[in-house]
């Protein structure tokens, strides 16, 4: 670390400490004032976990809402003094909308206002400083521009407000036809809403009118042409963008994409604009083909989470996909290599605008239900859809007590107290630059179909927004622990104390190094019987392109992080040691033995919210503990925005199908679900399905140890991580081995059972308490 970097880090740390202390003091004072006001008036603070019908319910959230609205107003305001009156009128309307349920003439609210403003600003400042620490000063300004863009634009484009925005820009250009910047923004708005031909026209005109934006405008025109299928025009536009600015890395990437569409790469591309790819060509025996259309899984949507589970309990795995711009999709396995879309008749289609989802049999009925996080950044109600056992689902969100309002990205089922009933955890983020952090939710299963949020009581308290999380028993004490993958900054590890409470042990575990990340999972990557942690990091597009061109991350980049469990309560970062050295925009990922050689591989679903942010999904093949990128060698050409990544033996033939739900944040950026199947079974295997009796029915949290050929393999039944959940059925690759020496099952309640003489190339079902399998 350079001297300048050292001083920057020290300054950031000191500022963080100061802001944290100031924020704590302000929050304490605010709490005291609120208690005093409640004592005088007899009116408690409003409940902020329920969805506001037509505006924020209290002063804190009203102030944050107004700050977010103001940021959007100034973000979209044309760069002209003549636009100021309209902006001021919009600000006045924003005050009315944000403070609809808050009477600022009330002395109590007036007294609270300065402290509410102070706590909002200290929260935002603390997050900003954490971002500098995580991202680094060289990339921070670019990241801030990115954050301002997505938080300003998402609320507009997820609603019909974008129509008003487009009309306002069009009216402005009638009177100001030479305003190339507004014309560029109009073209970008057309791209985001799927009006690609109009977008290309406006962006090309903007590029011709202002040399300062020529490269950026021509690049986005190239993206619009690409989506139109006009690949030659896309090539010309991206070449023009690079002529204007040879450092425009996204333009070089899209030129690479477009030229391949017409078979002209690299020779039809000027030499100075070519992009040599130095990664993804590692040696592998895997050869994939996309079977989504043939299997009936090729639905076009804004795909997010994927849950693979047996919803009708017929022994075959089915698929559910959460869609950001539509209803949830459910596909029934026909047992013949195809699926039938049963979304509407099952009722699950009404679970709209889903992001994260998880399947779990919370009432131990034998039929797993679905929990869905809705709307992500935009904020929505958590939903619980009970499986009725007859092919249909019923929304029981309100009556079960889980219907709370949050900007939630991921959820999971876990039996954290090992009482045989699945509990539900919901991980929350932010819905705007100035949003207040909503506490994560740990819903304890009361055993009567209802849940109680015990997160604060249990000690799971975090002031940081998180996108992903994972549960796993890292210290082998029989109780699942929680890892939070905080979006910007340090992750957090909460150790389960076994008494219903948790203790944060991040620093002492050696996990307090900051990064920018989406999701995570516990996985025994080295099969030593101790769970390791994979944290899927997210990089800006330029760093991804650098990795593609150089085969490694830039000096300031963050590769996928693998933390090895040291078996003493601590972890060590070993990514570079095991060959994981590239930056990707990983929004999802999973580990599974794709080539059946007995070693877990890693699949990354990559991309980003912006329309021009697309990149390949990545396969990192594990060769006896060393990983290599085999993406292109294996025939995985998919470029897009990979959210839910899942690996499952859908056809019970030993081939793990790689499922990828893709789609962007904007309504014009949809794509089609992919399902990549190996051309042939790569090796022998054993599939194991567990049924709990005293443990939860789906055996979530169970650990399995298989011994074959002189080595161990370890698996854990997961109740959800990333944007979705892996199947409860566990897959063991055996290579050329034809015998299994033994299989041990460690049930969540502590019982251990051992089985011998198991067959290969088949699925076995083990019921807790039984001395045999079938």
Describe each model-derived feature in a short phrase.
Residues 296-306, 347-358, 401-412, 459-470, ...:
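Repeat-based blade/solenoid architectures
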Residues 319-323, 370-375, 424-428, 482-486, ...:
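Hydrophobic beta-strand segments that make up the repeating blades of beta-propeller
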